[in-house]
Every structure is written in C-alpha cells, then in structure tokens.
Amino acid sequence: MNFISNRSREHEFIWQVFLTCLIALPVMYPVAWTGNELNYFALAQHHLDPRPFTELYAVNSHQLSKIATDIVMGLADRYLGLDAAWFFSRFALMIGLAIAYVKMTRALRIEVLTACCALIFFLVVGHQTYFAGEWIFGGSEGKVFAYILVMLAVGLVIQGNVLPAVILLAVATYFHFLVGGFWAGALFVYLYLNGHNRKQVVFGLLGFTVLVLPMVGLLIYENKILPPPDVSGLAFTIDQIYSDIRNPHHVAPFKEDYFHWTGGFIFFLLFSGFLYLVKRRQLFWNSHFVLWVGCLHVYLLFALAIAWFDRYTQLLGKFYLFRPASLLYLLCLLVVFDAVAKHWLAVSKKRVKIVTILFFTIAIGALVIKMPRMVQSSPDSLMSSLNREEKQLIQWIRTNIPEGTVILIPESSGKPLNSMNFEQLIDRPTLVSWKFVPTTRYEIALWYKRILLKREIYEGKCSSIKLLNVSHALAVNQFQVDKLSLCGDPLFSSGSYVLFTLH
C-alpha cells in the first residue's frame, strides 16, 4: 500500500510540475534574446577564456562574484554554441523553476489548483513584483539559478531540514550574491521565529558563513585589483552614476525628489492588508510563516525609508535593497490565495468554478497570444532576427575588418541590430554599451566617461575621437550619417547602415 501511495504522489508531483511549466511557458519560451542574456553569456565566455577579450569590449568586467553563473553559462556556450545554449537554458531553467515552485508549495501545503492560480496571478498581474522591476520567471540569468535554489531551500526550511537548505543557499550565493545572501539571512530569521532548535540555527548560520567565505574573498579581491576610480571631469559620484543615471528603475524610487513607484506601492499596501487579515484571523496553517512574510513586508518599508534618506548620495544603491520584492510578492500570493481557497471558495462550489474558469482562461489566452512567435522561433534566432541588409553588414565586417578593431554603434537604434547584440554578432569590440554597466567603482567611472564621449561623437564633436581612440563607427540613420560625415569617411553601406572610418 505504501508503494502504491508513493507512486501516486510521484505521478501527482510530475503532473504538477508539467502544469507549472505550461503556465510559465509564455514568459520562459525563448522567443527573443534579452539584453541581459546577451551580456551574461558574453561575460561567461570572457571569464572562461579571457585571452581573446580585452577591455575594449563593451561587455567586459573584472567582477568575479558570479563565478557559478560564469562556469555554467560559459560551458554551455562552449559545448552547445551560443544560440543553442541560450535556447536550451531557457527550458532547463523553466523546468528547474517549476520543480522548485512545486516543492515549495507542497511544503507549504498549498493545493495544486491554488498554487497554479497564484502563479498565473503572479505572472500576469504586477509584472512579477511589487516594484523595482524585479522578476523570477523570464530569461537565462544567474539570479534565476539562484531563485531555483532559494525556493528549494524555503521548502526544506518549512519542513525543518536545515542542513540541506544551508548548502542550497550557499550555492545560490555563488550564482547571485545578493539573492542567495538576502534569502539565507531571511530564512534564518524564519527559523528563529518558528522556535527552531537554537543550536541547529547557530550551527547552520556558522556553516553558511564558512561556505560563502570564498565568495567574500572574491568580492574583496575584485575591488582591490583595480585602481581607484578617476572621477575627474564628472558631475556625479560613482554611486550616483550607478543608481540615479543607470539603474533608477531598480534602486532609486525617489529620484528628483518625488516617488516613482506609486502604483506598485498601492499594490504592496493592498496585499500587506490581506496578509494582516490572514494573520489576525489565523487563516493559514503556519502562523509563523505568515508572520515572517509580514516582517519581510516591513523590511521593504524600511528599504523605502532608507532610499529616501539616501536619495542624494545613493551610497546603498548598489546593494539593490528592493530585490526581494519579487519572491516576497509570490510568497504573499500563496498565503492569501490559500486562505481564500480554504475559507471563502470552499463554502461554494459555484465560486470555485467561476474562479477556476477565470484564471485558466487568462493562462490559455496568454499562451495563445504567444504561440505564433513561439512556433516561429528557432535556436539560431540571434542571427535570424536580422534582415538581409543587416546580415550583409555583419558578413562584410567579419570579412574585411581586422579582429580587435573597435567599432562604435549608437544606443537605442530601435532596430533588430543594436548595441546589445552587435558585439556578439561581429565578434569585434564596441568599447561601451548603455545596457551593460560594470559594478566595480573603477569600471563604472570608465564606463560613464566612454558613454559621454561616444554620445559626443554621434553629435559630430570630432575631438572626442582621439579621447576614445577609435577608428570606426556605425551610423544607423540619416541624422547620424550627417554627423559622422563631419568626422570621417563612409567605408561600407548596407541599406540605412553606413560604416565610417573616423579621422
């Protein structure tokens, strides 16, 4: 009988994972590369074999603290090829997220239908977060690997399995220091609130600290190997450049002295209120878990207060204080949806049918909308997304421009060929890209100076060419052709694209 029962649970688990994958498919299917994916695969490639890649590459960093991500993505690129590695990594991460999500929801005793509805709501409403542009289900990045391990760890901690959870959290930290590190600390707080054996909690904390010490060493090392930043001529500090100029959507809600995340904050307050009702009326079986999720909501309020006082200096911007908002939103949804399902829907079969039909209609609708692009997609989509003129340009550059030659490309061209994928496609350095900003202080200063000088070149200020020491630039429209004509001569044209040799 136990054997039959175990087989039944295994089948139920597999079907729940399959259903979760189906729900996540519209956002995880590899329809098109994201800028982040291009950057992270390039970084992984560079770190695994740095010899061909110099500091002239736009995607180049001395950061070592995502070593696990670099190893996994770099090896996938090396043995599968870039496009195939990206294509299959999307599916691998989708399955990994599905397994982790199911494991976590089962540990929380969330019923299958409730877990599915909560995930649909999470993906469709609020863009997977309260605010700060965070997400879990989306692309191939180090933080997605980390979230898989964190969700598995949440499930283990709920079940009282501290040691394996500590190991998973340590590994998650090597994939993404901020994700793994924050949720490790948060889960130790949960163990304390839950009254777990204090001796085990202390040993678990010590074990985690020992396991991540090499990571701490890498963080110190990567900030010591570089010279101090050269901020001469800059109107902003390094922290202001990183937070206010490049990443305000993630870390600077009070930029220019007014609150930019009003809609998300109202959403946050609404679900905080729901969570309070669940706790007060004891509508969830694990009251300590509800208290813990509530405490994490209070943490976000403190983070907003800190961001207000830090709005001029941005000293803490690089720590991404709001990164937990995404997983916290998902955990809150699970608690609230479980309470609604067991204490409101349970009294009426009609309510259950209406809600079930509504949610699965939304899920099927999202899948149908995405299906045409999903069917047309293929593992070679990085090149196949280009038109004939763009492919001709890429081929000409690869054939006629020596390797190692820097070719500037403007930002935000609005075309399939852009500053995010150009460097990968031509296999030559492009010096700087707005999309990729490094994280060490020296490199941030260098990045911003290069951004400003490149902008001046595309405005026709030819004196900036010598400061950047570049010889080629690509124009993608007539305005840029007119400006670059002041500083150089056309070398090759393909449609609206004109490659210039700069004087």
What are the language-model segments listed below?
Residues F145-P164:
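Membrane-interface transmembrane helices that cradle and orient dolichyl/undecaprenyl
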Residues L25-F41, Q45-K66, L82, F177, ...:
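Transmembrane catalytic cores of multi-pass membrane glycosyltransferases
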Residues T209, H343-R373:
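Signature aromatic-anchored transmembrane alpha helix within multi-pass, membrane-resident enzymes
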Residues Y79, V157, V171-V179, L213, ...:
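Transmembrane helix irregularities
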Residues Y101-I110, V157, V340-W344, I397:
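Transmembrane-helix signature of membrane-embedded glycosylation machinery that interfaces
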Residues M1-E10, I158-P164, L191-F203, L330-I357:
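Membrane-interface junctions at the ends of membrane-embedded or membrane-associated helices
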Residues N387-K391, Q395-R455, E459-Q480:
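Short periplasmic/luminal acceptor-recognition loop of GT-C membrane glycosyltransferases, typified by
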Residues E10-F13, I23-A98, M104-L119, Q128-A146, ...:
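Active-site lumenal/periplasmic loops and adjacent helix-entry segments of GT-C-fold
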